[in-house]
């Protein structure tokens, strides 16, 4: 009888423990605390403005909190995210093309685009080839004709050396038959390149549609061609590389990442919450005002897209590293 009572007591205790465990799981259902979003640039930049716009509209059980960790062109913040706990409470807002360039340029041996979990992409930005009003050129063909007739006269700005922006530009320059006829000038970011173009220190630049939106509106920047497969909504009258017979179409999505091994539950929760924001007409209006284009891409599709770009861009980064 005592033995039977002991068995019953053991079962009751075990059941109580399981029940307590289940209750704890319910209490700690994700997210049970604020989710930090690392923005790897200073406040006021494109990634910062975009994330704060998402924070304005997102509906989560816990708040999404912005944490700016800038430096080294966004790499310091990216590495901070890489080394963070994979518990779903720290994510990264970043441009996948920058994430790719850190590895392809040799800044790190870690393949961050695959060593971070892709949550989703939310908007597209586009590299655009532009000139200034001082040049007098209205079309790509006019610029190319001048460059061929005046070797060495054109300085062409890019937003950084060993970047996707520069790799795209090298490929476009080659496709236009201008290799050796123009001088590429790398700057530290889009704002610096844009300023140089306005001051006529350079005559052409490759820069983001979001970075040039205000100067295009004022007439100081003349967009000649978008490096994309479709025309950006912000620049509907600007032809694309494909329209010009150039097979270079690397868009610039902006998206969100989590440390490797973050649970699928957390990834799905965040992706679904962000997807709802991207479908919000007010959010769409906000990002279009920034020169961006709302376009939700889930994590798997986003990762696959970037993997294809990596394969395409690797030989060009090798060329850049060799100084060719």
Which residues make up each language-model segment?
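Positively charged n-region of N-terminal signal peptides that target proteins for export
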Residues: 1-4
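Bacterial N-terminal signal peptides
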Residues: 8-16
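N-terminal (or domain-start) structured segment
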Residues: 21-114, 153, 177-206, 296, ...
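An extracytoplasmic/periplasmic, membrane-proximal ligand-sensing/linker region
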Residues: 32-34, 180, 265-324
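Hinge/capping helix and adjacent helix->loop/strand transition within the periplasmic-binding protein
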Residues: 58, 80-90, 103-192, 241-246, ...
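A ligand-binding cleft/hinge motif common to bilobed small-molecule-binding domains
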Residues: 96-107, 170-176, 203-237
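C-terminal lobe and pocket-closing loops
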Residues: 211-279, 308-312, 323-324
């Amino acid at each position: 009888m005592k033995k039977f009572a002991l068995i019953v007591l053991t079962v009751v205790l075990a059941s109580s423990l399981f029940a307590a465990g289940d209750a704890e799981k319910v209490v700690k259902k994700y997210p049970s605390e604020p989710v930090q979003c690392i923005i790897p640039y200073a406040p006021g930049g494109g990634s910062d403005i975009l994330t704060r716009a998402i924070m304005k509209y997102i509906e989560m059980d816990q708040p999404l909190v912005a944490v700016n960790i800038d430096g080294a062109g966004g790499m310091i913040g990216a590495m901070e995210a890489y080394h963070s706990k994979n518990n779903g409470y720290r994510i990264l807002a970043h441009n996948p093309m920058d994430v790719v360039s850190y590895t392809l340029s040799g800044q790190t041996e870690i393949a961050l685009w695959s060593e971070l979990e892709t949550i989703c992409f939310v908007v597209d930005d586009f590299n655009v080839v532009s000139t200034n009003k001082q040049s007098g050129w209205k079309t790509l063909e006019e610029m190319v004709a001048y460059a061929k007739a005046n070797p060495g006269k054109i300085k062409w700005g890019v937003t950084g050396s060993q970047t996707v922006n520069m790799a795209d530009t090298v490929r476009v320059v080659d496709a236009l038959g201008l290799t050796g006829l123009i001088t590429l000038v790398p700057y530290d970011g889009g704002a610096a390149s844009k300023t140089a173009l306005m001051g006529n220190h350079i005559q052409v630049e490759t820069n983001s549609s979001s970075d040039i939106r205000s100067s295009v509106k004022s007439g100081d920047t003349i967009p000649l061609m978008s490096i994309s497969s479709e025309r950006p909504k912000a620049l509907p009258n600007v032809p694309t590389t494909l329209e010009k017979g150039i097979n270079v179409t690397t868009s610039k999505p902006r998206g969100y990442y989590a440390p490797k091994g973050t649970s699928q539950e957390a990834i799905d929760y965040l992706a679904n919450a962000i997807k709802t924001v991207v479908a919000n007409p007010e959010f769409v209006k906000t990002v279009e005002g920034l020169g961006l284009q709302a376009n939700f891409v889930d994590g798997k599709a986003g990762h696959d897209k970037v993997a294809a770009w990596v394969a395409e861009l690797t030989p060009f980064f090798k060329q850049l590293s060799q100084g060719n």
